[in-house]
Regions:
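Expand to "…catalyze enediolate/carbanion chemistry for C-C bond making/breaking, isomerization
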Residues: 1-265
Length: 265
């Protein structure tokens, strides 16, 4: 049996902008092994979660190598949206970055600048991200064309500025960060939209400025996933590597108890 060739992970941005349905997950465990498993299954992208998990420069390097080896787009949710953090993961071969708590147009412009050479301020490095010099002078335009910038919308302030954020050139996708966004709205002083209303506001801004939407759900068969697809989400993330492990382990435990309880084994 032959297997269809995997898409070039460097085509991720093109596929995202074309609104191709894309499946991804968060990688919480700082190891290349889980990334290899997810990539081998055929996921379109993985997001190595530096913000909420103990990834460091060395483990990120190996995780991004594993993603590329299996034809999966490796993206990093950076812990700190600053030029050094963005430069290091792009040099190590990240296809793009996911920037947390983008709550103003200026922050969005800064992140776009730090992620691009031409018209930006990204420093030139010829490592894995630069294919070790194989493209020569073509590296700069190719990198600018293929680097993906995803802005996470996670704050009430971001909802208030969403039209300006979505209008920033170079912001390729808006991520509906509903966990932190819900906390921010509940903690807000004065009148604030509900989480459902806020999600619809972001969706409307994405349509207005022709930006793809991304989100994470616990399962694709859920009503939540269907609702988000209806709002225009095309880059859908399901759980995380640890979430999948917990699900599988819980199912095995349940099956074990059921089997012995019925005397089948």
């Amino acid at each position: 049996m032959t297997t269809a060739p995997r898409p070039d992970p460097r085509a991720f941005r093109e596929r995202l902008l074309a609104r191709e349905p894309l499946l991804g997950t968060f990688m919480k465990t700082p190891s290349a092994h889980n990334t290899e498993i997810i990539g081998g299954l055929g996921f379109d992208f993985v997001v190595l979660d530096e913000e909420h998990a103990p990834w460091d420069r060395g483990t990120l390097d190996m995780g991004l190598l594993a993603a590329r080896a299996f034809g999966t787009a490796g993206i990093v949710r950076i812990a700190r949206p600053d030029p050094t953090s963005i430069l290091s993961v792009l040099d190590d071969g990240a296809i793009g970055i996911m920037a947390p708590h983008v709550d103003s147009a200026q922050k969005a412009r800064d992140i776009v600048s730090w992620s691009h050479y031409q018209g930006g301020s990204r420093g030139l490095g010829i490592g894995r991200g630069g294919e070790y010099g194989a493209r020569g002078a073509d590296h700069v335009p190719f990198a600018d064309k293929t680097t993906t910038v995803i802005a996470m919308i996670e704050d009430r302030k971001a909802i208030e500025a969403i039209d300006e954020i979505a209008a920033v050139p170079g912001v390729d996708c808006l991520f509906l960060g509903r966990g932190d966004l819900g906390l921010s709205l509940r903690n807000a002083k004065g009148a604030a939209p509900t989480l459902t209303e806020a999600v619809k506001i972001v969706s409307a801004a994405a349509r207005k400025h022709d930006k793809p939407l991304a989100a994470v759900v616990p399962a694709m068969a859920s009503d939540e996933a269907k609702w988000l697809i209806g709002l225009g989400v095309t880059a859908m993330m399901v759980l995380s590597d640890q979430g999948f492990m917990r699900q599988a382990a819980a199912a095995a435990l349940s099956e074990f108890k059921s089997a012995y309880g019925r005397g089948e084994i």
